[in-house]
């Protein structure tokens, strides 16, 4: 988390003076960076079958929330695909995982990574058609799943784990994974710099994002806490999953919006505002979890 503010600051300056840079950076970051990041996280954490319960809870929370938000009733509050996706997918890579490393025992890392992997799979499978406005069908979902950077990253990690070089590659890929996170933060700062230069960042624009922010930072972690309680998850697993659910909107939402050239300003505003608010809301969730025992 130490790189958060410097990267946002430098990115903002770059975006202010070089407004075309975000458009050029997003495609290669999605195409090559995301698979490397996923592979590095998987190899580093050593994900095993004991995280299956956490994976199912994550799938139920994010997938179920997206299905619920498809109802026309929610269109009034979350009018764009980018707000619906941003309300349920969290930025666990640069925010949630470091929070777990800082606040919880090392055993919690695997559960944080599995949340990130499941969330990334859903984001990169459902996200492109949802944001671009293309009608979602079974065939299109399968096509997006096959082309998903997360699936490519998982495939790379599985293949590497089958070789004797897995420990070495885990160390080598960890640093490229961190570089991808830094580049994604720079991209967010650049997009915000472009928005500030054009006057797109203002109170009315952020007001429209309020329902998505409330859902992401308050409602989603509360639902995850209820699911963990109902399934009698251990305290460590519960704490990890709730803190991951409380993470700000995923930078992947901005990357998909950039690649689709749709609702980019709304995506950047949602990621930026949720990140700032999460600096206060996540510690409050942590204190609440400690009080609950």
Where are these regions (language model features)?
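Alpha-helical transmembrane segments of multi-pass small-molecule/ion transporters
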Residues: 1-293
